Structures are given as C-alpha cells and as structure tokens.
C-alpha cells in the first residue's frame, strides 16, 4: 500500500526504518506526547522528499454497527509546523473513508498539544470532549487529559 498526499507519501515502514522512527519518537518535542513503542510494525512511514519524517497508524472497528477508525501520528520536530502532519492525516483519512468505508474517524491528542489540535481541525476533526486522566506522561508518570476529536466522512476537508 502506498498513499500519496499533496506533499507526503504514506507507506509501510521498511526494514531498518524502525531505528529512524525510534530516534524521532525520542526527540524532546515528540517525546512530550508519544511513548516509544516496542516496535513500529503496522505503522505507515511518512515520507517527505525521500526522507522518513514520522509515522502514522490507524486502528479499525469493523463491526458494521460501529464502522469507524482511529488515527495516531508523530512527526520529527524539524518538519513540524509545515503542514506535513496535516497532509498525512488528511491522506490517511481520505483512504479510510473511501477505500475502507469508515463513516467516522477519531483522534485523541493530549489536551495540551495545541499544535496537533490545530492541525487536526484543518482536516475537519472537531472536539467532542475531554477524556480526563486518559494517558500517562511516560516522562513524569503523571496522568494527562486527552481531547477526543471526531470527523464524519462528509466533513473531511
């Protein structure tokens, strides 16, 4: 699978790219919001101008009564604020709606992650509510709130 956005390409993480993604997820600006995963299997690499600059993943609820999907994403600090994360989320969201038939998508950034929230709003995600003490900050051990955001298929921009 390879998905092309305006500026990024999303494709399965290739052998050896886990080391690159591990370095990215440990950058202070990324580590503030992401715990390093055990591995990057199942994630899609975000590629910009031939360079892996982050990763995006999705999970699906396939029960026809609740056919929706969720998205998680991280991007290297030096490429944040350039629209690449927005492009990656929009590209994956379009595929989840058109190819996989999902009618609703969710994303749940830390409530304090204002840059991510701004980016997701550009794709069409709307705040639904605060999930209190949703995730533990892996650096401090403190619980932090998350903002649940969702997007219906016809709201995708």
Regions found by a protein language model. Give the residues of each.
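Conserved acetyl-CoA-binding loop-helix of GNAT-fold acetyltransferases
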Residues: 82-95, 118-122
């Amino acid at each position: 699978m390879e998905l092309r956005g305006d500026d990024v390409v999303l494709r399965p993480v290739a052998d050896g790219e886990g080391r690159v993604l591990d370095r990215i997820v440990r950058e202070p600006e990324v580590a503030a919001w992401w715990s390093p995963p055990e591995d990057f299997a199942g994630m899609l690499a975000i590629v910009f101008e031939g360079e892996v600059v982050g990763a995006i993943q999705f999970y699906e609820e396939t029960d026809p009564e609740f056919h929706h999907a969720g998205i998680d994403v991280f991007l290297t600090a030096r490429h944040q604020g350039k629209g690449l994360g927005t492009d990656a989320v929009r590209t994956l969201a379009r595929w989840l709606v058109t190819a996989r038939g999902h009618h609703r998508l969710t994303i749940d950034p830390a409530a304090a992650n204002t840059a991510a929230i701004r980016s997701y709003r550009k794709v069409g995600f709307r705040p639904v509510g605060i999930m209190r003490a949703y995730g533990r900050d892996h650096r401090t051990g403190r619980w932090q709130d998350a903002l649940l955001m969702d997007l219906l298929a016809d709201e995708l921009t």
